[in-house]
Design a protein with these regions (language model features):
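Thiol-based oxidoreductase modules, predominantly thioredoxin-like and allied folds used
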Residues: 25-38, 49
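Short amphipathic alpha-helix with an adjacent loop that forms part of the alpha/beta core around
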Residues: 41-45, 72-75
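Structural micro-motif
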Residues: 45-54
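Non-catalytic, surface beta->alpha helical segment in thiol-disulfide oxidoreductase systems
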Residues: 55-78
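Short active-site oxyanion
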Residues: 1-3, 27-28, 57-60
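Local sequence-structure signature of Cys/Sec-based thiol-disulfide redox active-site neighborhoods
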Residues: 1-25
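ATP/adenylate-binding site constellation spanning eukaryotic-like Ser/Thr protein kinases
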Residues: 7, 47, 67
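Short alpha-helical
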Residues: 11, 36-37, 68
């Protein structure tokens, strides 16, 4: 399961979501401005900004628009 933690008007967030959508990679989106528990969770894992992409939990996660990591997800999904 892929979860993208995001906020409104976030360009890197939009790029990340667009990549996932264009490549038909299933994911859920959590707006951290509306979900304080999610915001606390990403902070607990050391992240200070969004987007944060978590793949099957935070053991495999990263911050920012990372085309290299997204390409890896695309390869797995194919």
């Amino acid at each position: 399961m892929i979860t993208v933690y995001t906020k409104p008007n976030c360009v890197p967030c939009n790029f990340t979501k667009k990549f996932l959508e264009e490549n038909a990679i299933q994911h859920s989106v959590v707006d951290v401005t509306k979900d304080s528990v999610a915001l606390d969770m990403i902070k607990l894992h050391g992240y200070q900004g969004v987007p944060v992409v978590a793949v099957n939990g935070f053991d495999n996660s990263w911050q920012g628009f990372r085309p290299d990591r997204l390409e890896e997800l695309k390869e797995v999904a194919e």
